[in-house]
């Protein structure tokens, strides 16, 4: 399509503040620490294993399919629905459920740190009621503040649709691991972008499968990855928080 055609159709393109908010929350500049996590990749690197680009893609795909999708994405979907209805008690139930499902302490602590930081940052410039109530619950010890729930509350406050909120989470998660691989010297920038591009269909499919899953159907099962993440937890010196 020509430049003239594009300019003639500008009036039909609907862009609003929620699109900018989506970019804001997914940006590495936003202070959640999401891009300082390797999710166990650093432990693999220091074990001496040589990982090919395709193996890295398969690792992220496994994490999306068996951990982040059925657990975090499910929690986000349920939390978003409760936040949109200002239902704090049900929101806190999701908070407790996803907290209890994160078996590795380092992963659990990182999720809480990111989620709490996200809520408090947004509260500093937003007076959304359910966001304020959730932040108060975290401060009072009635909630933990795991990232999927915090992101759902933040997305609701910014009028970001539920599925786009899930995109933020899965994209940030995938990029954090690719970024860790780059910083560890495991692959080059062009290869990293190729991996992200190859993951797009799976990210969309994982959201489709899990965003409307009921809370009682939430699950995760990736024992070998859990073991790797535990080994990172026990490392004395590390570059990444997970």
Residue spans for each PLM region:
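Charged, compositionally biased N-terminal leader segments and the immediate start
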Residues: 1-22
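A contiguous pocket-lining binding segment that forms or flanks enzyme active sites
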Residues: 140-185
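C-terminal auxiliary extensions adjacent to catalytic cores
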Residues: 49, 169-242
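Long, compositionally biased
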Residues: 2-4, 15, 77-99, 219-225, ...
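Glycine/small-residue-rich interface belts in oligomeric ring/scaffold proteins
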Residues: 22-86
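A short glycine/serine-rich beta->alpha loop
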Residues: 22-31, 60-66, 100-107, 135-141, ...
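Internal, conserved structured core segments that host functional sites
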Residues: 73, 78, 85-156
């Amino acid at each position: 399509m020509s430049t003239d055609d594009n300019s003639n159709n500008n009036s039909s393109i609907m862009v609003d503040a929620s699109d900018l908010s989506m970019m804001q929350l997914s940006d590495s500049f936003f202070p959640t620490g999401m891009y300082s996590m390797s999710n166990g990749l650093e432990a693999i690197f220091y074990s001496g294993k040589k990982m090919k680009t395709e193996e890295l893609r398969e690792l992220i795909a496994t994490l999306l399919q068996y951990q982040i999708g059925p657990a975090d994405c499910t929690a986000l979907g349920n939390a978003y629905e409760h936040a949109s209805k200002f239902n704090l008690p049900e929101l806190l139930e999701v908070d407790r459920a996803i907290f209890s499902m994160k078996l590795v302490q380092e992963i659990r602590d990182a999720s809480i740190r990111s989620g709490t930081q996200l809520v408090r940052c947004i509260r500093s410039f937003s007076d959304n009621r359910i966001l304020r109530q959730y932040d108060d619950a975290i401060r009072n010890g009635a909630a933990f503040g795991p990232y999927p729930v915090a992101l759902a509350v933040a997305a609701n406050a910014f009028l970001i649709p539920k599925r786009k909120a899930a995109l933020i989470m899965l994209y940030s998660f995938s990029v954090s691991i690719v970024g860790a691989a780059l910083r560890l010297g495991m692959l080059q920038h062009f290869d990293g972008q190729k991996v992200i591009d190859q993951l797009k269909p799976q990210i969309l499919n994982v959201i489709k499968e899990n965003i409307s899953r009921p809370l009682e159907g939430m699950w995760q099962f990736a024992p070998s990855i859990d073991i790797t993440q535990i080994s990172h937890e026990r490392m004395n010196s590390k570059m990444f928080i997970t």
